[in-house]
Amino acid sequence: MTTILDLLGKDADYLLNHQCIIKKEALTLPSGDFVSRVFAESDRNNRVLRSLQQMFDHGRLGGSGYLSILPVDQGVEHTAGASFAKNPMYFDPENIVRLAIESGCSAVASSYGVLSILARRYAHKIPFLLKLNHNELLSYPTTYHQIFFSQVEDAYNMGAVAVGATVYFGSESSNEEIVSVAKAFSRARELGLATVLWCYLRNPHFTRNGVDYHTAADLTGQADHLGATLGADIVKQKLPTLQEGFKTINFSKTDDLVYSELSSNHPIDLCRYQVLNSYCGKVGLINSGGPSSGQNDFTEAAKTAVINKRAGGMGLILGRKAFQRPFSEGVQLLNLIQDIYLDPTISIS
């Protein structure tokens, strides 16, 4: 049987024994009583606290303070053909929800169409997270603009416990998206729903000399900070891969201490800088799993989970690596990352 150490390979010591520049004592870390410790002191009403607790109590990670969410909104974001051609069973929304249930996920996140058509059968069996806005890829030339496909009331009526939305920070449409998401999240809180923000960057100028800074820790960290400012209970972010986006692109403001005293080039330090920007962990950071690369998916997923956990993150929201493979293997992959969060020997750095 392949172990986590086998999957980490030569990177095992590098990832499992690293000590972060920012000490964990400076952070609010995930735990079974996270909702009571953090959000009970906030302005969230009792119904929001209950909704959050439902996600934290559900699935294999229930009671741990960590989340394993299956997101399948790629049929809109990346087109259904590109997303499901490798595994056509997922054109049927029921198999999406079945995968989340059978793999013991904390919640399933998807579009209004997917969740609404199954709500009466499954909303009481697994927490629903309704993704409110999307970027559709049927416009030509391709544009990037998150528009609302559904409303907060739709989530409430179908029995969802949470809503999600994306803001493309740095894009031409970001100001409009910020305003619309702020209104939606305010309404969600009134109705007792938890809120998750996809804090993504989108700007052609964020690529310089062939290097893509959309995953720079300083830029993504600021996006997380803006997401927390919008009142998100949880922020979703891509795993950072490099640093010094602000300095290289030469825009906005930063400080040399960000790079010398608050982070390093180690992936766990880069991710910890994201956690730092998420109100020192008071707003949970979940990282995305990224695209499927085929045979390396298990190794990549294991490394991502180890980095997120050891950095002080709250879990993974992983989709394509799980559903773009046979059903049983998808369950196995999701269980793998859950095992990492449940493993007491993989400690927070």
Curated annotation (Swiss-Prot):
Supply the alphabetized keyword list: Cytoplasm, Glycolysis, Lyase, Schiff base
| Location of the active site | K236 (schiff-base intermediate with dihydroxyacetone-p)
State whether keyword Lyase applies.
Answer: yes
Q: What is its EC number?
A: 4.1.2.13
Which terms in the GO cellular component ontology are assigned? cytoplasm
- Read off the Pfam families from this record: DeoC
Its annotated compartments are: Cytoplasm
Q: What is this protein called?
A: Probable fructose-bisphosphate aldolase class 1
Task: Identify the species of origin.
Answer: Chlamydia muridarum (strain MoPn / Nigg)
Output the lineage of the source organism: Bacteria, Pseudomonadati, Chlamydiota, Chlamydiia, Chlamydiales
> What gene is this protein a product of?
fbaB
